């Protein structure tokens, strides 16, 4: 999938999606049936007979995504697929990407020059300088422990509370007296910080089964959110 979409202007949505299948020698009707499944997957029902010029930029990119998935690749490669979109449509497509990844569970290589986009979409991020990888790690570890000064420049202004999950900053369970408040380890810090900061004691961090897997003191939230930010004063 590329930022310019690369759709064939004389073919409809359905024909564009079916095209790579037909190139592989799949029978026309089978390719059309598969293409229609992809149309539904990316939410373009009712637009399968439209031409690219009749679609918005976001819709065109959905066609590109559907076409790339129709051939069932082992590795899904996306080269700056959303960079040509305006901010609102770009966010919509990022959310759509996450939905598809959750549904399909594919290995994805996603190239972007937008660090915030990488943090939102990536399970592991490789930051490169002059063709050499400076750091390859999870988003949380890159934000909390940048390996080089070059990487640190990327992370200085990152709003940590919007990126990090509770599990990224929690402590191991201990025998301390805890607050009555419990928070999920999968919560983004921003979503629960206000509740945690009203507590005097550490809160319990729980997993999907309601089991306590860690603790978190309110002071850790303050340190995490403000401790690593660049001082502009």
Where are these regions (language model features)?
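ABC ATPase "signature
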Residues: 136-137, 145, 215
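A short, proline-enriched helix->beta-strand linker immediately N-terminal to the Walker B motif
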Residues: 70-74
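Conserved ABC ATPase "signature" C-loop
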Residues: 130-131
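Conserved ABC ATPase signature
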Residues: 51-55, 59
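Short coil-to-helix segment of the ABC ATPase nucleotide-binding domain corresponding to the Q-loop/switch region
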Residues: 11-18
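Conserved ABC ATPase "signature" region
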Residues: 18, 22, 29-47
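The conserved cystathionine-beta-synthase
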Residues: 178-209, 216-233
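Catalytic Walker B motif of ABC-type/P-loop ATPase nucleotide-binding domains
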Residues: 76-79
């Amino acid at each position: 999938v590329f930022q310019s979409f690369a759709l064939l202007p004389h073919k409809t949505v359905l024909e564009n999606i079916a095209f790579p299948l037909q190139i592989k020698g799949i029978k026309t009707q089978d390719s059309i049936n598969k293409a229609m499944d992809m149309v539904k997957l990316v939410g373009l029902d009712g637009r399968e007979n439209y031409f690219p010029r009749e679609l918005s930029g976001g819709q065109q990119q959905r066609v590109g995504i559907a076409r790339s998935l129709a051939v069932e690749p082992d590795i899904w490669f996306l080269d700056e697929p959303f960079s040509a979109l305006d901010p609102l449509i770009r966010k919509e497509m990022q959310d759509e990407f996450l939905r598809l990844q959750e549904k399909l569970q594919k290995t994805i290589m996603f190239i972007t020059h937008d660090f915030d986009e990488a943090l939102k979409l990536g399970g592991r991020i490789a930051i490169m300088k002059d063709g050499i990888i400076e750091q390859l790690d999870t988003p949380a570890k890159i934000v909390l422990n940048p390996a080089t000064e070059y990487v640190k420049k990327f992370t200085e202004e990152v709003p940590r509370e919007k990126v990090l999950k509770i599990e990224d900053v929690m402590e191991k369970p201990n025998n301390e007296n805890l607050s009555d408040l419990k928070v999920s380890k999968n919560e983004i810090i921003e979503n629960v910080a206000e509740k945690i900061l009203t507590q005097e004691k550490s809160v319990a961090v729980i997993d999907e089964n309601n089991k306590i897997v860690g603790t978190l003191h309110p002071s850790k939230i303050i340190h995490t959110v403000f401790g690593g930010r660049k001082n502009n004063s």
